[in-house]
Every structure is written in structure tokens, then in C-alpha cells.
């Protein structure tokens, strides 16, 4: 039974770290060194869809937003109480949602519009904050975020830095951001 392997599993999941990719992530070989955020799917043997879904998670990781249509992919991705998409060590993973009515294009467009609206609001607040009396360190981090807000790589690091410096600020605009 699997009970004999619980200790090994816990060690692998909790103690082993994800190694840095020695190659460019955007190459076929290099993409395979990235952590997949799709695992234990319920697809049929030989399904050609899941390798592509796994590859996309390796290329875009926790920045992915998936607007799924009801069909085979909704069954292998989220059948019953299981979810094939997973999270990294920081607890971040792809955002997955499913529309029952085969309108996932419109549903996904709504997700995109919502994200763009939120990001525009944040950018406007960042511009206001840059004109305020915040510390120079905070302003440098704010400017870096603003300059690179549409650059996917490094987004998580910039967001973490921004969150950290804003905790030291006491202004209303810092709270809004």
C-alpha cells in the first residue's frame, strides 16, 4: 500500500527544492526544466491535450489565467473534488475557471477586462504615489513596477518588493495600492 511511502512523499514535497533552470525557458529543452503546474490529471491514456496544457504551465506558470469550456478538458482538469492544476512552493498557481455554457471566449474576455481594469487602477494610484512624499526607496520600487508592469518575467518579484516597501508607508495612497 502507499502508506509505506508517505515519509518519502513528504520528504520530496516538503524538503526538496526546485532547481534553477540551466537553460532558456523559451526553448523546447529549457521549458522542461521548469516546474509543471499541471499534475495528476484524469485524462484518458494517450490524450494529446494534457502535454500541451502542462507545457503552457511550464512557460507561464502562476501568471496563467485559464478560461475553460465545459468538455473533456474540464473533466480531466477538475473532475470531482480533484484539481489537476497545482501551486508552486509559494502557494501560487494558474487561475482556472470553467463556464458551463460553452461561452469561455466571452468568459475569458471578461476575466481579461477585469484584470486590465484593476491593473489600470493600480497604475494610476502608483503615478499619484510617485508625486507624494513617500521615501525614495519606495518611489524607486514604484517606478520599477510602473516601468515594467507589462513585462511578465519578474512580475512576482516586483510585486513582492512593492508589497514590502508599501508596508512601511502610512499614506492613504499606499493603502490603496
What are these regions (language model features)?
Residues 62-67, 72-75:
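Beta-sheet entry/capping signal
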Amino acid at each position: 500500500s502507499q502508506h509505506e511511502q508517505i515519509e518519502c512523499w513528504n520528504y520530496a514535497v516538503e524538503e526538496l527544492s526546485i532547481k534553477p533552470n540551466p537553460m532558456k525557458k523559451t526553448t523546447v529543452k529549457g521549458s522542461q526544466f521548469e516546474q509543471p503546474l499541471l499534475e495528476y490529471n484524469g485524462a484518458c491514456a494517450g490524450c494529446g491535450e494534457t502535454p500541451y496544457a502542462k507545457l503552457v504551465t511550464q512557460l507561464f506558470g502562476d501568471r496563467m489565467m485559464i478560461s475553460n469550456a465545459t468538455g473533456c478538458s474540464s473533466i480531466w482538469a477538475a473532475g470531482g473534488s480533484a484539481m489537476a492544476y497545482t501551486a508552486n512552493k509559494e502557494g501560487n498557481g494558474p487561475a482556472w475557471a470553467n463556464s458551463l455554457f460553452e461561452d469561455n471566449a466571452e468568459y475569458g474576455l471578461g476575466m481579461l477586462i477585469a484584470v486590465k481594469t484593476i491593473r489600470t487602477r493600480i497604475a494610476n494610484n502608483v503615478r499619484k504615489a510617485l508625486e507624494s512624499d513617500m521615501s525614495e526607496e519606495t518611489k524607486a520600487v514604484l517606478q520599477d513596477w510602473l516601468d515594467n508592469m507589462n513585462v511578465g518575467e519578474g512580475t512576482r518579484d516586483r510585486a513582492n518588493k512593492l508589497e514590502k516597501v508599501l508596508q512601511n508607508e502610512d499614506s492613504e495612497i499606499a493603502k490603496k495600492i
